[in-house]
From Swiss-Prot:
GO terms (BP aspect): bone development; carbohydrate phosphorylation; cartilage development; chondrocyte development; embryonic cranial skeleton morphogenesis; embryonic viscerocranium morphogenesis; heart morphogenesis; lysosome organization
Organism encoding this protein: Danio rerio
Similarity comment text for this entry: Belongs to the stealth family.
Gene3D superfamilies assigned: 3.30.300.320
LNR repeats: 443-478, 508-538
Assembly: Hexamer of two alpha, two beta and two gamma (GNPTG) subunits; disulfide-linked. The alpha and/or the beta subunits of the enzyme constitute the catalytic subunits.
A single Gene Ontology CC term: Golgi apparatus
This protein's name: N-acetylglucosamine-1-phosphotransferase subunits alpha/beta
Domain EF-hand residues, every copy: 970-1005
UniProt effect for mutating residue 447 to Y: Partial loss of function due to loss of UDP-N-acetylglucosamine-lysosomal-enzyme N-acetylglucosaminephosphotransferase activity toward some substrates
Recorded catalytic activity of this chain's protein: N(4)-[alpha-D-mannosyl-(1->2)-alpha-D-mannosyl-(glycan)]-L-asparaginyl-[protein] + UDP-N-acetyl-alpha-D-glucosamine = N(4)-[6-(N-acetyl-alpha-D-glucosaminyl-1-phospho)-alpha-D-mannosyl-(1->2)-alpha-D-mannosyl-(glycan)]-L-asparaginyl-[protein] + UMP + H(+)
Amino acid sequence: MLVVNSLLKLLQRQTYTCLSHRYGLYLCFGGLVLMIVSAFQFGEVVVEWSRDQYHVLFDSYRDNVAGKSFQTRLCLPMPIDVVYTWVNGTDINLLKDLRAVRQRLEEEQKALRERLGKNGSEITEAPKGRPECLLSHCIMGPVLVLDPALPANITVKELPTLSAAFSSAKELLQVAKPLHPSSSVTALLFHSHTEAEKAHADALKDLLTHSISRGYLTTDKEAPGLVRMHTLAYLSGFPASLKETEQLRVKLPAVVTSKTKKLQLYSEASIALLHLNTAQDFTDLTQQAKKNLTLDGKELTVSSAFLFWDLTAISQSKQDEDVSASRFEDNEELRYSLRSIEKHAPWVRHIFIVTNGQIPSWLNLDNPRVSVVTHQDIFQNQTHLPTFSSPAIETHIHRIPGLSQKFIYLNDDVMFGKDVWPDDFYSHSKGQKVYLTWPVPNCAEGCPGSWIKDGYCDKACNNSACDWDGGDCQGSSRFGGAGGSVIGGGQPWQFAGGLGGLAGMSFCNQGCANSWLADKFCDQACNVLACGFDVGDCGQDNLNQLHRIVLRRNQTLYTLPQGELRPYFSFSGLANRVSEAHVADNQVLRHTSVANKWKTIHLLLLPGHNATQIHYNITFQSTDHHDFIMTFSVSVDTRELPKSNTSTPVRDKEEEPKPTVATPEPEVPFEAVPKEKQGPKVREQTHGDVQVPVLNETLLPDEVKIELKKLNEKLMSGDITIKGFNLTKAMLLEPYKEKDQFTLKHEKDKEEKQKLSPVAQLQNERAAARVKREKGENVDQLKPVAPSLVPVQIDDVTTKAQSRLFNIEKPHMFHLLSNLKGNLSKERDSDSEGHLRERPTGRRLQFYSDSLNRGFLPWEKRKFFQDLMEEVNRLQTELQYTADRTATGRRLQDTFADSLRYVNRLLNAQFGFTSRKVPAHMPHMIDRLIMQELQDTFPQEFDKTSSHRVRHSEDMQFAFSYFYFLMSAVQQLNISEVFDEIDTDHSGVLSDREIRTLATRIHELPLSLQDLTSLEQMLINCSKSLPSNLTHLHAVSPTQEAYYDPSMPPVTKGLVIHCKPITERIHKAFKDQNKYKFEIMGEEEIAFKMIRTNVSHVVGQLDDIRKNPRKFICLNDNIDHIHKDAGTVKAVLRDFYESMFPLPSQFELPREYRNRFLHMTELQEWRIYRDKLKFWTHCVLVTLVVFTVMSFFAEQLVMLKRWLFPRRRVSKDANPERV
């Protein structure tokens, strides 16, 4: 203690001594400052060290909207921002600019008309869009309405005298006009929509004195101008799973089918139209429905059908082009979309809202996580502004300052419905996740994308818009050949459209392309029995309607019933999954694929083929992850079974079936046709003495045993007679008559062979082979040659594996196409007309509709400039035709669809012809570097898109062009990278082991000694012929690598790169890989709803989202805001938003506040004024503080000055002369 006190006193004394020194105070102050600075530096070093050690905890996972760590959920610790594009359609300044742009377009149109020598004020009549029907169960019926009415005494048989188009009419009705009962119209009923559509098109040319309209049917009897159809009725209430007319007809009660002449199913509306025999039948059906009329436990409802033909009297037209605030009204979708981000995606780092300078009135601009970006901030060429085109704006959003490399782009009408994570968009293992929907619109009418570059010159595709059928109509390729739609062609994401025969040329259902089957999308057009319910894509609910076969380990032959086209094989009890599958190419195959999700193998067959066998080679993976290979055959016979109790005319064997397409050719006279061929022949067939095959029933398949057991039960119960029993049993056992004898003989030979010794067996086999060679027998009759195998598509095989599997050529396909090139081209050309008339019903979320407008700007959704753009394009086309008589142009129908076709043509020219689909309307994750690379690839096209003031037919569609560039870009093979991959020890020189690895990569397995010696000889020859400055052999130590062959030089990277024979083999063995990884996703998590003005329909759409929440929700506003029900629809929509996201987000101001400025220019001017005011205010405050201090502490300041700067004192005793 004494020592401590002594040290303290010493420290005190030294401190006083230092302070009493002349410069002691300065030293103390300097030491204090140095200590503070050192403390800060030390703290900074500590923080940096802690950040380096715990940067994951401090930065990546907490740098987000929520400000908390998502370390347990995020798989990508990278910052991800969100970009919105938003506009306020009710802004007065914006409406003025829109009027100015429209006026400018009208002036350009007027100038074009003057150049053509036409009246500048004359407007060409443009095709107007059909108004929307807002009535309940409103459908277009098979009815034509003629105004004024035909003579009252005319009959249906006399209609062809007026016009040949009416020859297919089945009924004629004289109907009084509801609003004018004194006058009437004539309603013509047809059997189908196709007949009505064709009659409408043809009658417009013949009957110029009558107005011909299509008739509409509805159940809403309260609407004005309706006429009840007594022989038509609506049927509803049946299960929605019934997608085909025949399915519904079979299940309907007899009381309904007995009173109907025809049934038409509208699966999209879940209703059916009944053509009744008499008017009394409707009364009987309604009474029966009140008692008991059910189908699969559901009550059926029969309703009256009301006819109307004037849609303008029912609903208001959507062609009103007046510029009004209500037309482009904002429903505050952005507010609720931001709430969905805070609720379901709080890991987002920052939110950028791109506007034309507008500011949402409710947006909290003080929030550091949100920023408003104007067009001036991102457009490189300011002369392109102002712009009212969404593609032009989207072209520049990746140039936002401070934007993350990967960002998510959303429109304001898109939001999240469930928790979303970055791996929903991108993962390091599989790359970008691409969500695709409906196909790109056809390049020309009647020319689907699957016809382009398929080896045939198709008439409908032989035009400039389709690049002359992708080259099929130019040169020798027009006569057939290996097209782009066969397996192995196209991109890895392009699935095979079929296997053998005509599978790629005919569809299993109207509107269901073969390439849509098993493509991981549930296509509505393919979700029917004829297509096997999209072969597993639409779940397993309807698999019970297909023929099921259970695979067994020890069974190698399965036999299908005659006429069966849609079987599937279940391996649930056999293995866990299928890792690889091959099938022998066969003409009867339409499609086959594996669905590991349901543990099934699906098979679709073409009808009308004789008995044959399909051979499978499947690699299964058991539950313990051990692979085993199973080979089996399927015996098929797709000819239809003969129908009993019916007589059919005998068709001449040499006659080819003619397509049922109406042609203007004259009728063929029947004088030259023999009498025996002018009528049907009655086949006299007696069933009295039916020969039932006697077989060993224990060897029959289980399915046949079950059918025989049921047949015996029916006979014992008296349901069938002996004759029927024998006839049915003979039909069941007929396919196994010859097969059973061969099976028994094979089993017997097998038993005898097992009794012999191995030497005796070998001697017998050689003797048998020798005898067969001497007699010239064909051994292949008993054991067929293993056919060429093609890979089978598997649902969960990765993209890389799929491309590897599908890179196998089909040797029989080219020969088959060459044989059928003549008649197939003719059939397709004739069928194209039928394809135009009978449009497919489309796919849910996968069909193009002109109302499905992808622009986020409200005037694009309302098609405000559409009429002007169509007129300008028509005039430009006419001007081009005037200048060049040989030029032809395609009439613009829809700007968005034409821009898709335009981009598709560019992609075809850059990456090759293939079928493409449009990305879903949902949030898209974009990589800035990839987007910049895309724009560097098409610089002129993107610059042209940026220059368009309004949407144009030659715009580069943002998501479509980006994702297909990402999926199509190819990484050129780099020999240096291949060398580095093989050089596993990174020594720069390949060893003997590594040379063998190289040999396995460039040669087929198994390797032979000749393969290795030839490779070594190539390297030796190249080392002698190439200069040393290329091979760098002199830089390698002689002892670095020792080879078995002493003459072998060191295999350096330079030697491999410059050795031409080696590089050629490497290029042949190593294919160019995709530059970017990607994964095709389904649409299970996407909910796209087109919100129109029908209140009940909108409520049903929103309730569907409530019941089935999805991750990505888009409510596309297509409301007619001037309609009387628009307010109700918007209220329902607002109520839905509030029910989904009731809590305000941090990006909103309180409800009682709103932004003072609604434009960025006003805000920026105010901020400049604020900053200036703040600067001068600070200056004044500093001045006041200085004067105040000087006034109150004047004496102290003088003393401080004297103390800091003391005067020098002159000593009185100092005498310079004194020594």
